[in-house]
Amino acid sequence: MSSKNKVLPKQPEVNIGTIGHVDHGKTTLVQSLTGVWASRHSEELKRGITIRLGYADMAIYKCPKCEPPRNYTVKPVCPSCDTKAEFVRAISFVDAPGHEALMATMLSGAAVMDGAILVIAADELCPQPQTREHLAAAEVIGIKNIIIVQNKIDIVEEKRARKSYEEIKNFVKGTVAENAPIIPVSAQHEINIDVLLNAIEEIIPTPERDETKPPLMYIIRSFDVNKPGTPIEDLDGGIIGGTIAQGKFKVGDEIEIRPGISIEREGKTVYNPLITEIVSLHAGEKSIKEATCGGLVGVGTLLDPSYSKADGLNGNIAGKAGLLPPTLSELTLETHVLERAVGTKELLKVEKINPGELLLLHVGAAVNLGKVVSIKKNMVTVKLSRPICAPSSSRVAISRKITARWRLIGYGIMLVDEPT
């Protein structure tokens, strides 16, 4: 079923996250849909788990002759009747790591997800710790369009598959995924992939985007594509990757990246925004002249590649020079605390936030430590360890250290709109 067509007919217009517990088959599912193994880094391949955010694109096609759900495919020719299929839309997948130690990476990816596929393995009891944690994270970030994939149905007997289904139904009761469809799938053998594609079309529509606003892109990856020993005159500039939340970018545009890079000045660390030019745009494995909202986009720049290597610009925002939100070193949040911490084996009550406490904050794709400096009812002011750039009213995921790990305890709405 997987599409081996690398070049998509159009730029992806929606980002779908694959979330869930480690080893439940998220990356295998993405491969069965896209033909791309999203865990491409050597350490990931060696350990068999996703460490960084994975990403892959696919096109959805619809056969004009076959009945649903069989009419949905990832190939331009219908595999059932050999009829030329009609292109529906292109999609980017963001494959989030399921290991508890990598929750911060999952939350950074959640910031750019328009919908999510929660993958739950039928051969394990539900919920596993990160199944619970990832669903809570999706709820906190505000992801409402969710599909549940009951994976690995090929390795369990029918009785266990039915029991697993009941466990899933009980687990999602009262959550944002209470009414989500539960689709039994074998990602390994590509069973029921057409049913999943049908559900994606029904449950995760392309959000309305405003392309008239000043462009704004969340950076979730950055690279140096040059091989060691490349002569200086042949070096390519740094590459940034992410999703455009509003507006559009064109080749030749001058852009600003905030908060930028840290430099030492008079014994203090300050952050300098970067100004550069877009020299190339890539989406869906092809070069484009203009990139619009939705999907994952690669942006070639004239930046010194030492800035962008090894995800060095992750968490920054890119936009037109002078039109980005202010850079902030302090945030005031209207906080909403969960009843129970998520991700722990035991269900622990969340205590109230205290002055002087250290919290881990996810603002857009940025992750940052913050010290609580004042509290007034549910308004919490936090001094950041390093500045961030984010639009006002952004949702901020809040984590606290519990049993030696950062655990999600709630979220806040950013109220600060002035540089500090």
Predicted regions, residues:
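C-terminal effector modules of nucleic-acid-centric enzymes and ribosome-associated factors
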Residues: 15-18, 156-158, 304-420
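Conserved catalytic-core segments of large NTP-driven translation/proteostasis enzymes
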Residues: 8, 170-313, 317-324, 329-337
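Conserved Switch II/interswitch segment of TRAFAC-class P-loop GTPases
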Residues: 87-92, 96-102, 110-134, 139-162
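G-domain G4 guanine-recognition motif of GTPases
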Residues: 121-123, 144-162, 182-193, 315, ...
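P-loop NTPase switch module centered on the Walker A-proximal segment
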Residues: 2-104, 113
